[in-house]
Amino acid sequence: MEKFITIKSTVVPLPIEDVDTDQIIPARFLKATTKEGFGKSLFCDWRYNQDGTPKADFVMNNPLYSGQILVAGKNFGCGSSREHAAWAIGDAGFRVVVSSFFADIFRGNALNNGILPVQVSDAFLKSIFDAVAANAKQELVVDLANQVISIAGTDLKESFVINEYKKTCLINGYDDIDYVLSIKDKIEAYEKTSKYLSLLA
């Protein structure tokens, strides 16, 4: 996975609450088993007409909005468990999703796929939406090392929480296997000195 330290980017605002995984990636697209190619189907039913043409009123079809940060309403990623939702978001180019609440399973799937879910207060989320409404090119700065998100050019910022293990993985670009391999020497040293493991030899 790509290393993640600090991202400064314009945003794609999606001020809709309770966005579930079927809205993120409809079930009819779940037949594929590889991660690539799902980005074009992200928010498909909102993004395209039945004939496949883009809906002009959907934010991802508006040339004013682009970037690596998706900002969504409260309770993002609810509904059925499907890792494809994280795959679609990542394949569409997003590295960060900001909301005031995430479904637990979506949060885990996002982190496992190199996407940082940043949970902020309702008030700070509103500040972001207000700033982007006033200026479509407004940038956010997401500082993972210090666990701070800020609205660029203003004094508005807020800290966020992340599991320390997942933080380490994101900063180093590790998935779970990469992390285990990175501490292989420590594991082997422990195996040699552990009296409990020696009993199994």
UniProtKB/Swiss-Prot annotation:
Pathway entry: Amino-acid biosynthesis; L-leucine biosynthesis; L-leucine from 3-methyl-2-oxobutanoate: step 2/4
Catalytic activity as recorded in UniProt: (2R,3S)-3-isopropylmalate = (2S)-2-isopropylmalate
Signal peptide start and end residues: none
CDD domains to which the protein is assigned, alphabetical: IPMI_Swivel
SUPFAM superfamilies (alphabetical): LeuD/IlvD-like
One GO cellular component term: 3-isopropylmalate dehydratase complex
Presence of the UniProt keyword Lyase in the record: yes
A Pfam entry, by short name: Aconitase_C
GO terms of molecular function: 3-isopropylmalate dehydratase activity
Keyword Lyase: yes
InterPro entries: 3-IsopropMal_deHydase_ssu, Aconitase/3IPM_dehydase_swvl, AconitaseA/IPMdHydase_ssu_swvl, IPMI_Swivel, LeuD
NCBIfam families: leuD, PRK01641.1
Record PANTHER family: 3-ISOPROPYLMALATE DEHYDRATASE SMALL SUBUNIT (PTHR43345:SF5), 3-ISOPROPYLMALATE DEHYDRATASE SMALL SUBUNIT 2-RELATED-RELATED (PTHR43345)
Subunit annotation: Heterodimer of LeuC and LeuD.
Biological role stated in the UniProt entry: Catalyzes the isomerization between 2-isopropylmalate and 3-isopropylmalate, via the formation of 2-isopropylmaleate.
Record-given protein name: 3-isopropylmalate dehydratase small subunit
Organism: Cytophaga hutchinsonii (strain ATCC 33406 / DSM 1761 / CIP 103989 / NBRC 15051 / NCIMB 9469 / D465)
